């Protein structure tokens, strides 16, 4: 049973963008729950409110607002300190629950002006577009193709707006998803036949495969159960990958603790009712 197991974790790779690790001695349901928490339950900061004061570009206001919301913002240093806006006592926005951004760009040249994430000015140095994280004071040190394009302006066109970033999680909206991708596998040699290959010899082998070069898949094991899970968690840049993992596990632990507490109250209530 899953609750009787003693899982072990082994990290195989850790970079600024992703973390790879292996969990053993656990259940498929638990492993998939962890994967889902990575995606949907880890809070980050994202733009959620936009007031457009001037927009003469070819894109409607709604297009621009949606693009702004999907720009990843650095959240490592502030997400735990920021309140959810629904829990804040302020009437609209305040430093306790939001971060303000402004953008004011006008094209005065014949050449097309690219409005990008670098044009977003934050009132907090801890929350900036991820692509601006390593930018120096000299603009020549930062190439434009690294920035996220918002809209293109021609001569005489302008875009001026104010926006607020708030704390949220992926279950509310995809813009609060801290991951660019979360993958896990549990049968690298296809011994459980969870996938039927038309031509097994043509399929690329998993990086975790233990087969010899001349083997395409392991012999079928009808009694086998997945107990080892290989994860690859890639961050969108808002949080470091190890922060995503630790925050997700902490959140899952809290959910289980709350469930246990609530269940205990229900049982006690039933006992009192019977008596």
Swiss-Prot record:
List the InterPro entries. DNA-dir_RNA_pol_30-40kDasu_CS, DNA-dir_RNA_pol_insert, DNA-dir_RNA_pol_RpoA/D/Rpb3, RBP11-like, RNAP_Rpo3/Rpb3/RPAC1, RNApol_insert_sf, Rpo3/RPB3_RNA_Pol_subunit
The record's Gene3D superfamilies line, in alphabetical order, gives: DNA-directed RNA polymerase, insert domain, RNA polymerase, RBP11-like subunit
Sites where Phosphoserine occurs are at 124, 257
Renumbered to this chain, region (Disordered) spans 203-226
MF GO annotations: DNA binding; DNA-directed RNA polymerase activity; protein dimerization activity; zinc ion binding
Name the job this protein performs: Core component of RNA polymerase II (Pol II), a DNA-dependent RNA polymerase which synthesizes mRNA precursors and many functional non-coding RNAs using the four ribonucleoside triphosphates as substrates.
Q: What name does the UniProt record give this protein?
A: DNA-directed RNA polymerase II subunit RPB3
């Amino acid at each position: 049973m899953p609750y009787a197991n003693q899982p072990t974790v082994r990290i195989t790779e850790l970079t600024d963008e992703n973390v790879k690790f292996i969990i053993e001695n656990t259940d498929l349901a638990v492993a998939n729950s962890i994967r889902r928490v990575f995606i949907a339950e880890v809070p980050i900061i994202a733009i959620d409110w936009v007031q457009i004061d001037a927009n003469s570009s070819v894109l409607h206001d709604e297009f621009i607002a949606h693009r702004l919301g999907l720009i990843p913002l650095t959240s490592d240093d502030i997400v735990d300190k920021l309140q959810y806006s629904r829990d804040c006592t302020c009437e609209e926005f305040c430093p306790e629950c939001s971060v303000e951004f402004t953008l004011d760009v006008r094209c005065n040249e014949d050449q097309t002006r690219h409005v990008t994430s670098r044009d977003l000015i934050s009132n907090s140095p801890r929350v900036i577009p991820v692509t601006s994280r390593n930018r120096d004071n000299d603009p020549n040190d930062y190439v434009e193709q690294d920035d996220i394009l918002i809209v293109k302006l021609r001569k005489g066109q302008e875009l001026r707006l104010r926006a607020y970033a708030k704390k949220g999680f992926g279950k509310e909206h995809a813009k609060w998803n801290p991951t660019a991708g979360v993958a896990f596998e549990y049968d690298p040699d296809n011994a459980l036949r969870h996938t039927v290959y038309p031509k097994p010899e043509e399929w690329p082998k998993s990086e975790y495969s233990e087969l010899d070069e001349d083997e395409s898949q392991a012999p079928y094991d009808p009694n086998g159960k997945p107990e080892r899970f290989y994860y690859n968690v890639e961050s969108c840049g808002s949080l470091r990958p190890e922060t995503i993992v630790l925050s997700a596990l902490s959140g899952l632990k809290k959910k289980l603790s709350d469930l246990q507490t609530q269940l205990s109250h229900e049982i006690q209530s039933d006992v009192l009712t019977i008596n």
